[in-house]
Amino acid sequence: MDIFMGIATADGGEGLRMLLGMAGTKRTHALMDAMLTMSGEAKSAAFLQGLWAQVSIYRGTMLSFLKNYDVILCPVNALPALEHGTSFNPGIVPAFSYTIAHNLTGWPGAVVRCGARSEGLPVGVQAVARPWREDVALAVGNHLEAALGGYQRPPLTA
């Protein structure tokens, strides 16, 4: 989590602000506001180089783990889907740790619905494969989707 946040905010949030401006964004989500606030000052090139070295070590560790497996199956997030309007708490960011962990590798993954909470909100599973094995991630995602019923529209309430 620290590596991801360090890289995402290494420029003091200027890159995010630039993208928001290019997109014509007038209002941002509370989590984006929190990330921009946490950005602080731009970090040094040496600091960023150290973070990328940690990413390389992390990728090597993950690749060693995957020597014995074709795919990792894991939750998408540490929490089930949130009800609309409840994700404004910046303290929820650690719940995205499963997604962030695999985003750091840059490796292929597929996310599919595997069920639903009692309220009808979807629960997902992600399949993450080795580098350059999109075919494996997509095949596993396709199999899971077929076996578990695929996309089902959640109930919409006002």
Specify the residue positions occupied by each region the protein language model found.
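Short, surface-exposed loop/helix-turn segments at secondary-structure junctions
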Residues: 2-4, 8, 79-100
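Short helix-loop capping/hinge segments that flank enzyme active sites or metal/cofactor-binding pockets
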Residues: 6-63, 113-122
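Generic structural marker for isolated residues within well-ordered, non-membrane alpha-helices
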Residues: 16, 98, 141
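Structural helix-boundary/capping segments
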Residues: 49-53, 60, 104-158
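An anion/phosphate-binding loop that grips the pyrophosphate of nucleotide cofactors and donors
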Residues: 69
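Glycine-rich, N-terminal phosphate-binding loop of Rossmann-like dinucleotide-binding domains
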Residues: 76
